[in-house]
């Protein structure tokens, strides 16, 4: 009965999963282990039976008879199923060789799949890189087109007098201009003899409200000999003008002579104003000392010019004064005529 139970187990194991190869291997291993265990049990039983008395031999004969009777009772369908289940196991070497071939095929398939997957991944990566490059190129083209459109838009102003518009989306330069060579103050040479900062305190001359007078006074005191040189140069130029015959040379000499005379006249006027101012200050100090005044009265610039002009005409002779007054009248008349409207200027002319 034990053999029929084993056969039934084999049949059920095969029925459980006929399609899977791994279950067949497991069932074959179980059958081998069971058969080996049965053989070991039978060997042990034989050894024990050989060692035992003849009574045991009779019991063995009874057991064989029982097995034969049990085998005779098994149906042909069960035997066919058992044969089907045991058929592949009898060809163990071939089955094993077939399994190795299947494993090799599976490995080859996996290798080919891995290779295909690797090649597919590489192709996909290349495709992505190609797409990225195409997108980048398209973006650069779009940016160029947009820049051109912006430039055209910037150039197209409402009028030529309209201010130019510049976008603030420009990258800041990484370089910073620490010292600009154009805006750096260049070293200028100066002569301290003619510098007002030095002359204002030279020779005991203190600063006053008339900043132009004290510097001129210091320069006049220190370089009074230059007036003699200027007079000599003026006479020399007049002599050259008298001897010259070319028109261009005469025009150039006349221009130089007039500029020198104007400069000399301006210096004389400044000196006259300085003398008038000095006389006025001296007079005011004397009045304060005498107690006739409590506070000094300071001349305005307009009053100072009037006093200087009055002193100038008083120092002149009769004919020279008349010429000076006539010259002054013409100068004032021309100035007023320039300020007059054009319609009135024509009527009076």
From Swiss-Prot:
Q: Which residues form a coiled coil?
A: 101-147, 227-319
Q: Where is this region: Disordered?
A: 1-174, 259-278, 313-349
Protein name per UniProt:
rRNA biogenesis protein RRP36
**What's this protein's family per the entry?**
Belongs to the RRP36 family.
What are the alphabetically sorted keywords of the record?
Answer: Coiled coil, Nucleus, Ribonucleoprotein, Ribosome biogenesis, rRNA processing
Biased composition annotated in UniProt, kind: Acidic residues: 36-64
Give the multimer and partner information: Associates with 90S and pre-40S pre-ribosomal particles.
Transmembrane stretches in the record are none
For the keyword Flavoprotein, the answer is: no
Q: What does this protein do?
A: Component of the 90S pre-ribosome involved in the maturation of rRNAs. Required for early cleavages of the pre-RNAs in the 40S ribosomal subunit maturation pathway.
* Species name: Arthroderma benhamiae (strain ATCC MYA-4681 / CBS 112371)
Offer a single GO CC term for the protein: nucleolus
Does Nucleotide-binding show up as a keyword for this record? no
Q: Where is the composition biased (Basic and acidic residues)?
A: 117-158, 265-276, 313-325, 333-349
Q: What's the name of its gene?
A: RRP36
Location in the cell? Nucleus, Nucleolus
**What is the protein's major site of localization?**
nucleus
For biological process, the GO terms are: maturation of SSU-rRNA from tricistronic rRNA transcript (SSU-rRNA, 5.8S rRNA, LSU-rRNA)
């Amino acid at each position: 009965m034990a053999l029929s139970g084993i056969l039934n187990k084999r049949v059920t194991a095969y029925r459980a999963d006929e399609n899977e190869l791994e279950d067949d291997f497991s069932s074959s291993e179980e059958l081998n282990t069971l058969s080996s265990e049965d053989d070991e049990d039978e060997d042990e039983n034989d050894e024990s039976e050989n060692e035992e008395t003849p009574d045991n031999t009779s019991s063995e004969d009874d057991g064989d008879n029982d097995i034969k009777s049990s085998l005779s009772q098994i149906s042909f369908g069960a035997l066919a199923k058992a044969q089907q289940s045991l058929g592949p196991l009898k060809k163990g070497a071939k089955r094993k060789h077939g399994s190795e071939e299947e494993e090799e095929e599976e490995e080859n398939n996996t290798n080919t799949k891995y290779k295909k997957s690797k090649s597919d991944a590489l192709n996909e990566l290349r495709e992505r890189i190609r797409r990225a490059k195409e997108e980048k190129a398209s973006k650069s083209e779009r940016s160029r087109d947009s820049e051109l459109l912006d430039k055209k838009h910037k150039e197209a102003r409402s009028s030529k007098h309209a201010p130019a518009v510049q976008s603030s989306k420009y990258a800041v330069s990484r370089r910073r201009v620490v010292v600009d060579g154009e805006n750096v103050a260049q070293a200028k040479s100066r002569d301290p003899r003619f510098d007002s900062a030095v002359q204002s305190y030279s020779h005991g001359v203190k600063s006053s409200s008339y900043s132009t007078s004290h510097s001129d006074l210091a320069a006049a005191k220190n370089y009074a000999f230059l007036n003699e040189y200027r007079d000599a140069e003026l006479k020399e130029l007049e002599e050259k003008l008298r001897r010259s015959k070319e028109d261009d040379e005469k025009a150039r000499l006349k221009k130089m002579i007039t500029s020198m005379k104007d400069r000399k006249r301006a210096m004389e006027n400044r000196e006259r104003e300085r003398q008038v101012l000095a006389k006025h200050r001296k007079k005011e100090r004397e009045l304060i000392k005498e107690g006739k005044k409590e506070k000094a009265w300071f001349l305005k610039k307009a009053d100072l010019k009037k006093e200087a002009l009055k002193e100038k005409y008083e120092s002149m002779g009769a004919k020279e004064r008349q010429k000076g007054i006539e010259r002054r009248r013409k100068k004032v008349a021309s100035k007023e005529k320039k300020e007059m409207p054009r319609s009135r200027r024509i009527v009076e002319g």
